[in-house]
């Protein structure tokens, strides 16, 4: 390393899995830095004179990946709970309907308390590889129902979603 002298003589990395414990350690002065601040605590931390918040856009995205390749997916059932004879997720209209049924604005405002941006692809604006052609799907439950009916599912179907829990901020709530 041939750059300027670092500002620290040593750094100790202390993994603290529990979000409340991380926050308590910061407020008690036991640690100097934490990441993954719970959204419910951001407003409070903004009023803490000894705390400086830093926010930025990241490439952390929670997305829905559906089982569109198997003929008989294990976690997809008919509207009345029977095994499917044809995978509805293979139909692009069904996948588009699922996307249209997600209220991204509500997720940002209610679940993430305003500290997120709606995602329409894996990379946010400003990241290499992002496509300006892919737009965030508008929330349109009526349009989603229409597409499901066109695809042959006027009564819908059942799908079990699996997702992380306590790996990312509010991940289980988002799912």
Which residues does each PLM region occupy?
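Extracytoplasmic/periplasmic ligand-capture domains
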Residues: 1-111, 117, 127-175
């Amino acid at each position: 390393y041939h750059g300027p002298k670092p500002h620290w003589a040593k750094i100790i990395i202390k993994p603290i899995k529990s979000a409340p414990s991380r926050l308590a350690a910061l407020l008690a002065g036991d640690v100097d830095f934490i990441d993954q601040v719970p959204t419910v605590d951001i407003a409070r931390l903004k009023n803490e004179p000894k705390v400086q918040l830093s926010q930025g856009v990241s490439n952390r995205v929670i997305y829905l990946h559906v089982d569109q390749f198997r003929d008989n997916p294990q976690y997809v059932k008919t509207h009345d709970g029977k095994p499917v004879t044809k995978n509805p997720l293979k139909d692009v209209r069904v996948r588009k309907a699922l996307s249209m049924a997600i209220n991204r604005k509500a997720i940002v405002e209610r679940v993430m308390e305003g500290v997120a941006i709606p995602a329409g692809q894996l990379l946010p604006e400003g990241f290499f590889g992002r496509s300006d052609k892919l737009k965030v799907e508008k929330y349109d439950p009526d349009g989603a129902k229409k597409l499901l009916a066109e695809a042959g599912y006027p009564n819908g179907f059942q799908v079990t979603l699996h997702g992380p829990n306590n790996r990312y901020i509010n991940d289980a709530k988002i799912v």
